[in-house]
């Protein structure tokens, strides 16, 4: 649940009961129980679906909003022998989205006209590996930066523009700037 709430991409691989035992109660079925707190949750009972389901899982891990993925595999499948043609796994591509140019222009106009702007950087900046770009932008524009707890290391805390971390708790400086800011990016 925490990984889902924090948009953390992790792959969970729990074992499952043999298919013949899955209909008996009480049986914990992870793929069913975790469906609402994962991006993708599935069970593999047939070796012929193994490659396809792993491709689907890794596509979910690589694309869109980050989050946990679960593939539950029946124990007999893990212990069995593969019969038939060796599957050809192809890693799915990572698709990147791009901000709309019109939206970027409007945000930039609002930022340029702001008198007391502030940046809140989250873990998306970490996943994008944009720490250098963030620092360069903040320094060039002279905009103070606070980070979310998950994005804490994206901006140096000893930097003169650093306001510290904000989340359920917030530093006094970040709270002051957030209350006084006329534009938060």
Describe the predicted segments one by one:
Residues 1-185:
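N-terminal alpha/beta PP-like core and its mobile active-site loop of ThDP/TPP-dependent enzymes
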């Amino acid at each position: 649940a925490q990984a889902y709430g924090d948009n953390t991409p992790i792959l969970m691989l729990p074992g499952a009961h043999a298919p013949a035992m899955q209909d008996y109660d009480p049986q914990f079925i992870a793929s069913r129980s975790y469906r609402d707190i994962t991006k993708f949750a599935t069970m593999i009972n047939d070796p012929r679906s193994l490659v396809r389901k792993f491709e689907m899982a890794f596509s979910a891990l690589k694309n869109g909003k980050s989050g946990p993925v679960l593939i539950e595999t029946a124990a007999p499948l893990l212990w069995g022998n593969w019969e038939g043609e060796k599957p050809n796994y192809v890693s799915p591509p990572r698709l990147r989205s791009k901000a709309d140019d019109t939206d970027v222009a409007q945000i930039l106009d609002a930022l340029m006209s702001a008198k007391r702007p502030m940046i809140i950087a989250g873990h998306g900046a970490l996943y994008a590996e944009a720490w250098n770009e963030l620092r360069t932008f903040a320094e060039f524009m002279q905009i103070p930066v606070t980070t979310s707890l998950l994005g804490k290391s994206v901006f140096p805390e000893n930097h003169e523009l650093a306001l510290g971390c904000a989340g359920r708790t917030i530093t006094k400086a970040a709270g002051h700037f957030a209350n006084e800011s006329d534009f938060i990016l």
